Amino acid sequence: MPRPKKCRQLSSCVPCSLFKPNGIPAANLSQILLAADEFEALELGDVQRLSQLEAAAQMGISRQTFGYLLASARQKVATAITQGLVLKLPTPNDKDPI
């Protein structure tokens, strides 16, 4: 039985709710959901350029968990861009199980 997930400390505000290819209605496209903790990992690791150790400490998780979140987020973003899918971003109204 897996251990329960730790609460993550999230501070990033999402500027919009989704990204999609131009000129195609979102209803006609498949979606990829980026979780709130994955979005935070991208923000801390790639935008703020923190080390994995610093970013993990800021989120209140282990460095290894941060690495998994960052890899998952990068894979989802790359898939959405290369395959022309909708990338749905977390909003404050979303129910996040974390």
UniProtKB/Swiss-Prot annotation:
Question: By what name is this protein known?
Answer: UPF0251 protein SO_0727
Q: Name the family the entry cites.
A: Belongs to the UPF0251 family.
HAMAP family found in the cross-reference section: UPF0251
Q: Which organism is it from?
A: Shewanella oneidensis (strain ATCC 700550 / JCM 31522 / CIP 106686 / LMG 19005 / NCIMB 14063 / MR-1)
Domain of life assignment? Bacteria
Q: So which residues are the signal peptide here?
A: none
Q: Which InterPro entries match?
A: UPF0251, WH-like_DNA-bd_sf
